[in-house]
Design a protein with these regions (language model features):
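Basic, often amphipathic N-terminal segments
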Residues: 1-112, 125-211, 224-237
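Generic recognition of long tandem-repeat/solenoid scaffolds
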Residues: 116-120
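Small/polar glycine-rich anion-binding or flexible loop at a beta-alpha turn
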Residues: 213-221
């Protein structure tokens, strides 16, 4: 039986949708099937956007790649030793059933500090309500933060509100600080990746035209190789 060091609650694009296909080839990691994607296949796919090689992509997606293409609802956490994964799954399914599926707004490319992501063109209160509910009701499943985990969040650079959220809920960018996004690259240096992303943005309808409804939430787990893969998904009502 596989062991997972951390768990996360995500939105993931529907399997075989144009957006899921894009994320799979962009990162070279398929979290829904837990497998790496051959670089030759990636280049063949990305040619449709005018991207001819992976050099500018791969050096900027190494960190984001391990998490798979997703939108975070609850960021990765270690499971409290007093609870089992089955209990976590059952509670997550219970919460999912309390929410009705809803519409996404249109997506656009945005630079946020030193990373790039797809974001909706306006705040979606439905996603915020879902994330907040998940954070509150699944908080007991989270192991207490260690000093090392707190230090990783650079507390001296956080606002007072973000610091309070970190200590109360385990992560600074949730609850009132939550902003749904689907990361494309993080820790970006230089502007070469931006030029590749502009090619994606000019053709974004190819990958975004099928994504209308937010209708499922996913539980991902961090495997022994440090890659996050899908473990289960639950439909909204």
């Amino acid at each position: 039986m596989k062991k997972y060091s951390r768990y996360a609650i995500y939105y993931a694009p529907p399997k075989e949708s144009s957006l899921e296909e894009f994320g799979r080839y962009w990162f070279g990691w398929d979290p829904l099937n837990a497998k790496l994607i051959n670089n030759k296949h990636r280049i063949n796919y990305l040619k449709r956007f005018g991207i001819k090689n992976l050099i500018n992509i791969d050096k900027n997606v190494l960190i984001a790649k391990k998490y798979g293409f997703h939108g975070t609802l609850i960021p990765p956490f270690k499971l409290n030793k007093n609870y089992s994964t089955n209990t976590l799954f059952k509670k997550t399914e219970e919460i999912a059933k309390k929410f009705k599926k809803f519409k996404f707004y249109k997506f656009k490319l945005k630079k946020i500090n030193n990373f790039y992501a797809f974001v909706q063109n306006k705040k979606n209160n439905n996603i915020n309500k879902l994330s907040n509910r998940l954070v509150r009701e699944l908080f007991k499943f989270r192991s207490p933060l260690t000093k090392k985990e707190i230090d990783r969040r650079n507390p001296s650079k956080l606002s007072k509100l973000q610091l309070n959220i970190l200590y109360k809920w385990g992560y600074p960018y949730i609850m009132s600080e939550f902003n749904f996004h689907m990361t494309l690259a993080s820790e970006v240096t230089g502007n070469k990746l931006y030029l590749e992303l502009k090619k994606i943005e000019r053709n974004k309808e190819i990958i975004l035209n099928e994504i209308n409804n937010f209708d499922k939430i996913y539980i991902f787990g961090e495997n022994q190789k440090g890659m996050f893969e899908n473990l289960e998904n639950f439909s909204l009502s």
